[in-house]
């Protein structure tokens, strides 16, 4: 990776180190549903405090549209959970600008950790509009002024240019201060980058999810890079329509059928679609179901891939040396239509001798549900960011970091 990393930082002891982490965790009534993203940030935080740095953490949490949102989306419970994981006191400051924050930072001792309030409170707490989300340079400069060096460890927001990532990095570099990648960001770029740019072959991509429109760029980019691209999930049926198959009441993007036709022609035998599907007479876990090959009957909608498709996909995957999986094979949140997604997750968990990378909420949830997460090479923490990276796009949060 041609970007400077936290390991390149010199003389951290006594320095104020700003760290953009991704603590955007599911939270309800102050209870954290999944602390994975907090855990993922620990190596970078630990490195800074072990070397005597003062770790000042910034993160967003959810989208803030009202004062009501602010009560639900405070980072206070996240700071408490971080303290438990680090087994040390973590200071929380209920603001992200002003005297209270500045005093708390100036009072920090070496090896201490401080979490400031949700950066997106800046999207409503002022007369200037969405200062954080719109990357207000003055806000980036202000936050940069609070530290001696900046570490971006938030891959989940790397595809967005916000004041708390691009803004701070830009201001730091303008003042000849370091702006580097944390261990998590470095790991994401390493695994996703190597998978796409220098994969051990055969390289198989598995793409699921509801919409072709969300994944068009990724499909096109990966068709040029991968040996096979497996397509499942709701977007399958736009491809079915493009092939002239009947799709019943299945999800379809009418305005993307022509594009799907072009992709099928361009891909040749690289593109692998499900040969059979589990269909239902209603979008419900209790609906009447059947397994059908090819055409989907009128009055039915396809909600998962069928057993022959699972066997086909596993046959393609069994010899793979690199696999990237993003998106479910069916309506994963309904048990009766989760089998395809779970089967792929289980197969990848038991695939030996291959680099296996999983991204996206449902795919990640599937491997966790199966307990095979630790058997995979890498679980990406970025949904949209990993998709844009797989599409070959430059991510602003990474571009803003200092080059080696």
Curated annotation (Swiss-Prot):
Molecular function GO labels: ADP binding; ATP binding; phosphoglycerate kinase activity
Keywords: ATP-binding, Cytoplasm, Glycolysis, Kinase, Nucleotide-binding, Transferase
Main location: cytoplasm
Catalytic activity: (2R)-3-phosphoglycerate + ATP = (2R)-3-phospho-glyceroyl phosphate + ADP
Residues holding ATP: 215, 333, 360-363
InterPro entries membership: Phosphoglycerate_kinase (IPR001576), Phosphoglycerate_kinase_CS (IPR015911), Phosphoglycerate_kinase_N (IPR015824), Phosphoglycerate_kinase_sf (IPR036043)
Protein residues bound to substrate: 22-24, 37, 60-63, 120, 160
EC number annotated for this UniProt entry: 2.7.2.3
Record-linked PANTHER family: PHOSPHOGLYCERATE KINASE (PTHR11406), PHOSPHOGLYCERATE KINASE 1, CHLOROPLASTIC-RELATED (PTHR11406:SF23)
Similarity annotation: Belongs to the phosphoglycerate kinase family.
Protein name per the record: Phosphoglycerate kinase
Gene name per UniProt: pgk
